[in-house]
Amino acid sequence: MSVTKKDVAYIAELAKLRFTEAEQEKMTTELNAILHYVDKLNEVDTDGVEPLSSIHDQVNVLREDCLKPSLDNEEALKNAPDRQERFFRVPKVIG
C-alpha cells in the first residue's frame, strides 16, 4: 500500500489543513516511509508466540472511589475575569 499526493490532499482537506506543494511532497514521502515500516512488521515470524494481553497478573488495580470536598460554583468563579451566570466566559476560539 502506498500513499499518493492525491491521498495527502484528501486527508489534508478532511483535517482542514493546507500544505504547500513542497509540504505535500514531504508528507507523502513520510507517510509512505511509515507504511513501509508497518509492512516490515508483517514479515516478522510470530508462529508459536502467545498473544500478550497484559504485562502483569493484576486485574482492575484501581483506587477506591470516594467523595472529597470540592469548590462550590461561587468559589470557583470568584476570580474569573469574565463570567455569565454560573459559567466562565471565554473568548471565542473557533471562527
UniProtKB/Swiss-Prot annotation:
Its EC number is 6.3.5.-. It holds the Pfam family GatC. Keywords: ATP-binding, Ligase, Nucleotide-binding, Protein biosynthesis. GO terms for biological process: glutaminyl-tRNAGln biosynthesis via transamidation; regulation of translational fidelity; translation. It comes from the Bacteria. Signal peptide: none annotated. GO terms for molecular function: asparaginyl-tRNA synthase (glutamine-hydrolyzing) activity; ATP binding; glutaminyl-tRNA synthase (glutamine-hydrolyzing) activity. It catalyses: L-glutamyl-tRNA(Gln) + L-glutamine + ATP + H2O = L-glutaminyl-tRNA(Gln) + L-glutamate + ADP + phosphate + H(+); L-aspartyl-tRNA(Asn) + L-glutamine + ATP + H2O = L-asparaginyl-tRNA(Asn) + L-glutamate + ADP + phosphate + 2 H(+). Heterotrimer of A, B and C subunits. HAMAP family: GatC (MF_00122). Belongs to the GatC family. PANTHER family: GLUTAMYL-TRNA(GLN) AMIDOTRANSFERASE SUBUNIT C, MITOCHONDRIAL. Allows the formation of correctly charged Asn-tRNA(Asn) or Gln-tRNA(Gln) through the transamidation of misacylated Asp-tRNA(Asn) or Glu-tRNA(Gln) in organisms which lack either or both of asparaginyl-tRNA or glutaminyl-tRNA synthetases. The reaction takes place in the presence of glutamine and ATP through an activated phospho-Asp-tRNA(Asn) or phospho-Glu-tRNA(Gln). This is Aspartyl/glutamyl-tRNA(Asn/Gln) amidotransferase subunit C.
